């Protein structure tokens, strides 16, 4: 290798080392499923044409996101995970990464090489560090138990689909005289596909006699934000006394049973009586016979000593119907 080539290689290595050592990462943020702008911030002070430059971006694993080779895009060098997800803005020299996912966070590098008489020479490099955010849903409080005085109520609060991992979650009880924080049992989970977090907290809060009205809300803390739930109004109700069994209920029930029994007895007795008509008829016949005999005795008592023939006939007539009637009943 001649001295010229050795010297040129040394200069190239020196320039790259200088660029790498002095390169500072620019922190940028993007939201989940949105677009991130990966800057290059190259100042083309010499007004070089894109046909003289090679521009490309790579991630921290050295996978190529985009390459513009002498003014033409080269998709063959792009990693499959980035195909169709990038677009280059020639005016701002920003690379737009679309449909950002949690796994896209990390360091990205922009390289600019110039093609001269001696080949490609690196003239610019910039690092940028991408962080991905996803807003948690507004925390939502769910009441598990009823609210009464001198008893604890059970609450849960939950928020989902957020990133990065939340730091803390707690309840706040606000009354007329004080504001109190309540911790609870926190549960976190992370989706294996999206990388987003879900979080919930469960806790109990006790109300004293002097609390007439209050509000409860839930707070979710992340690295940079706090998210609040809607205020949940609390108006503890007085405990409902347990009523003892009332005596009048038992009395009414007993009365109904007795009345039903009497009605049933009378119904059965009447039905049985209707099924035996001969007994009544016999009693009626006996009563008629007794009356006839009594009449006859009265006739005999008042009978005159001498009865004319006509009177005897009349007496005979009076006796005959009675005897016939008695015979008919027998």
Swiss-Prot record:
Segment forming the signal sequence: 1-22
Record-annotated Ig-like V-type domain positions: 33-127
Disulphide bridges: 40-110, 157-218
Residues bearing attached sugar chains per UniProt: 33, 135, 146, 154, 177, 192, 198, 213
PROSITE patterns for the chain: IG_LIKE, IG_MHC
GO biological process: adaptive immune response; B cell activation; cell surface receptor signaling pathway; cellular response to lipopolysaccharide; negative regulation of T cell proliferation; positive regulation of immunoglobulin production; positive regulation of non-canonical NF-kappaB signal transduction; positive regulation of T cell proliferation
A cellular component annotation (GO) from this entry: external side of plasma membrane
InterPro entries: CD86_IgV (IPR037677), Ig-like_dom (IPR007110), Ig-like_dom_sf (IPR036179), Ig-like_fold (IPR013783), Ig_sub (IPR003599), Ig_V-set (IPR013106), T-cell_Activation_Regulation (IPR051713)
Cytoplasmic face residues: 269-330
Processing after translation: Polyubiquitinated; which is promoted by MARCH8 and results in endocytosis and lysosomal degradation.
All residue ranges annotated as the Ig-like C2-type domain in the record: 150-225
Complex formation: Homodimer. Interacts with MARCH8. Interacts (via cytoplasmic domain) with PHB1 and PHB2; the interactions increases after priming with CD40. Interacts with CD28.
Protein's recorded name: T-lymphocyte activation antigen CD86
């Amino acid at each position: 290798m001649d001295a010229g080539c050795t010297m040129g290689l040394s200069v190239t290595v020196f320039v790259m080392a200088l660029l790498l050592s002095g390169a500072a990462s620019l922190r940028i943020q993007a939201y989940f499923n949105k677009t991130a702008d990966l800057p290059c911030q190259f100042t083309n002070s010499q007004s070089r044409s894109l046909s003289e430059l090679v521009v490309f971006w790579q991630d921290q694993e050295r996978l190529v996101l985009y390459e513009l080779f002498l003014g033409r895009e080269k998709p063959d060098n792009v990693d499959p995970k980035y195909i169709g997800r990038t677009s280059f803005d020639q005016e701002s020299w920003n690379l737009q990464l679309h449909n950002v996912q949690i796994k896209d966070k990390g360091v990205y590098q922009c390289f600019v090489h110039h093609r001269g008489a001696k080949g490609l020479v690196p003239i610019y490099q910039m690092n940028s560090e991408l962080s991905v955010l996803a807003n948690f849903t507004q925390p939502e409080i769910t009441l598990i138990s009823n609210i009464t005085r001198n008893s604890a109520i059970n609450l849960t609060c939950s928020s989902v689909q957020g990133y990065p991992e939340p730091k803390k979650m707690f309840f706040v009880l606000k009354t007329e005289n004080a504001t109190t924080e309540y911790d609870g049992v926190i549960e976190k989970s992370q989706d294996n596909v999206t990388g987003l977090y879900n979080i919930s907290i469960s806790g109990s809060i006790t109300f004293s006699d002097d609390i007439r009205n209050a509000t409860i809300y839930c707070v979710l803390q992340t690295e940079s934000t706090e998210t609040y739930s809607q205020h949940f109004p609390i108006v503890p109700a007085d405990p409902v006394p347990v009523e003892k069994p009332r005596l009048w209920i038992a009395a009414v029930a007993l009365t109904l049973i007795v009345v039903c029994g009497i009605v049933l007895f009378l119904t059965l007795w009447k039905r049985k009586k209707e099924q035996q008509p001969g007994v009544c008829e016999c009693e009626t016949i006996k009563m008629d016979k007794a009356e006839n005999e009594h009449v006859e005795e009265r006739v005999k008592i008042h009978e005159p000593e001498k009865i004319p023939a006509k009177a005897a006939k009349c007496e005979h007539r009076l006796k005959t119907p009675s005897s016939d009637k008695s015979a008919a009943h027998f």
